[in-house]
From Swiss-Prot:
Keywords: Cell cycle, Cell division. It comes from Prochlorococcus marinus (strain MIT 9515). This is Cell division topological specificity factor. The keyword Cell division applies. Belongs to the MinE family. Disulfide bonds: none annotated. The lineage of its organism: Bacteria, Bacillati, Cyanobacteriota, Cyanophyceae, Synechococcales. InterPro entries: MinE, MinE_sf.
Amino acid sequence: MTLRDLINKLLGRETSSANTARERLQLVLAHDRVDMSSLTTDLLDKMRKEILDVVAKYVEIDFEEVAVSLETEDRMTALVANLPIKRTLTGEIEFKKNHDNPKKK
């Protein structure tokens, strides 16, 4: 159910079949634009590594429990990343930032 459908339902309006058909067609077209065959194992591994590199700058990750996968449901494909966080590194980031760039007096 889209936000528009929810608003229409709350206001007592019925969704026309034309609008429903248009929304379904938009979903199909969006799905067709994504060429899933181009997402090779090598590309997924590269994406996984880059995502982990970025997230690891800010939090400590339990790398043994990381899971990255492609999930398809109702004509929609999602890249799902489950990254268990051990702790945040914000204090260490601030410390490094202050000591790497000392203010001149």
